[in-house]
């Protein structure tokens, strides 16, 4: 059955893989991204075969007005919202360091995108899902939701909050036919991580900490999302699907 999915941060990396996977199975997608130009380029290079099934919406996920307008546009275009994938996120300044050297502005920015953005997305779609009596929300968290990343206090804090928000939504709406789960990826090769993985020494350092000795792919993240959004996961609710090559198992 064809569904309507909203994917934030849809123009590259994990978001692109997720949105494309929905489209490939015949679903309609509202693709949200901060840059209208990047969305247009992505549509031209990756989604030309699905032109009638994609709604491109420029939106800042941390802006309530943008998010509400994007949800309204999706309802107007497609008439339903079956799945929300809160994928948009930022890591923050890699030089921010430990907590006492992290600028307040940097902390606020990371929390605004990574936590407020998911809160606003959930808040905007839930009334529609309640009316439908069904819906699925998948939040892209991180292994940093489970273990602290050294020198990344803002990012680690934000991803911990994402996991707790996921559980809160699951508990509050489980009786209404709505499921909410999180995907917790480890190191995934995307444009966001490419600067590190392109440096052989840093790549080796990353691989040394992963028992499986592999870097994950955006396609694998999309696999996890499709499982949680699908009929094989109807009793999975409030869960964290960890995909990290056993990184957090040691």
Curated annotation (Swiss-Prot):
Binding-site residues, NAD(+): 12-14, 33, 60-61, 87, 188-192
Pfam families per the UniProt record, alphabetical: adh_short_C2
Record text on activity regulation: Inhibited by the arginine-specific modifiers 2,3-butanedione and phenylglyoxal. 2-(2-methyl-2-hydroxypropylthio)ethanesulfonate (M-HPC), an achiral analog of both R-HPC and S-HPC, and (2S)-2-hydroxypropyl-coenzyme M (S-HPC) are competitive inhibitors. Inhibited (at 70%) by the coenzyme M analog 2-bromoethanesulfonate (BES).
Listed EC numbers: 1.1.1.268
Biochemical pathway: Alkene metabolism; propylene degradation
Keyword NAD: yes
Positions with a binding annotation for 2-oxopropyl-coenzyme M: 152, 195-196
Keywords assigned by UniProt, alphabetized: NAD, Oxidoreductase, Plasmid
Site (Lowers pKa of active site Tyr): 159
Phenotype for residue 196 to A: Almost loss of activity with the natural substrate 2-KPC, but does not affect activity with 2-butanone as substrate
Site label Transition state stabilizer, positions: 142
Single GO MF annotation: 2-(R)-hydroxypropyl-CoM dehydrogenase activity
Catalyzed reactions: (R)-2-hydroxypropyl-coenzyme M + NAD(+) = 2-oxopropyl-coenzyme M + NADH + H(+)
Superkingdom to which the source organism belongs: Bacteria
Record: active site: 155
Entry annotated with the keyword Transferase: no
GO BP term (any one): propylene catabolic process
InterPro entries membership: NAD(P)-bd_dom_sf, Sc_DH/Rdtase_CS, SDR_fam, SDR_superfamily_enzyme
Subunit (UniProt): Homodimer in solution. Homotetramer. Component III of the aliphatic epoxide carboxylation complex together with components I, II and IV.
Stored NCBIfam families: PRK07231.1
Note: Enantioselectivity is dictated largely by differences in kcat.
Domain comment in the entry: Interactions between the sulfonate of coenzyme M (CoM) and specific arginine residues are key to the enantioselectivity and catalytic efficiency of R-HPCDH. The structure is stabilized by the interaction of the terminal carboxylates of each subunit with divalent metal ions.
UniProt record similarity statement: Belongs to the short-chain dehydrogenases/reductases (SDR) family.
Function: Involved in aliphatic epoxide carboxylation. Catalyzes the reversible oxidation of (R)-2-hydroxypropyl-coenzyme M (R-HPC) to 2-oxopropyl-coenzyme M (2-KPC). The enzyme is highly specific for the R enantiomers. In vitro can also use achiral 2-propanol and short-chain (R)- and (S)-2-alkanols.
Listed name of the protein: 2-(R)-hydroxypropyl-CoM dehydrogenase
């Amino acid at each position: 059955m064809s569904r309507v999915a909203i994917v934030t941060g849809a123009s590259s990396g994990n978001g692109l893989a997720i949105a494309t996977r929905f489209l490939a199975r015949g679903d309609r997608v509202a693709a949200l991204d901060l840059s209208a130009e990047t969305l247009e380029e992505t549509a031209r290079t990756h989604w030309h075969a699905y032109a009638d099934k994609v709604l491109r919406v420029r939106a800042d996920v941390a802006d309530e007005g943008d998010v509400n307008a994007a949800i309204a546009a999706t309802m107007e275009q497609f008439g339903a919202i079956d799945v929300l994938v809160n994928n948009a996120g930022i890591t923050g300044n890699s030089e921010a360091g430990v907590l006492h050297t992290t600028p307040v502005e940097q902390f606020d920015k990371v929390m605004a995108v990574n936590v407020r953005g998911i809160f606003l997305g959930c808040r905007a779609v839930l009334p529609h899902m309640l009316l439908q009596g069904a819906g699925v929300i998948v939040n892209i968290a991180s292994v940093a939701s489970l273990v602290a990343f050294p020198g990344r206090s803002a990012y680690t804090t934000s991803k911990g909050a994402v996991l707790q928000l996921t559980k809160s939504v699951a508990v509050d709406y489980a009786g209404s036919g709505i499921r909410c789960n999180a995907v917790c990826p480890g190191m995934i090769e995307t444009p966001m991580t490419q600067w590190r993985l392109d440096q052989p020494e840093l790549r080796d350092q990353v691989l040394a900490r992963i028992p499986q000795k592999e870097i994950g792919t955006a396609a694998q993240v999309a696999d996890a999302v499709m499982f949680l959004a699908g009929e094989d996961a109807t009793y999975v609710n409030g869960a964290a699907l960890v995909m990290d090559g056993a990184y957090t198992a040691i």
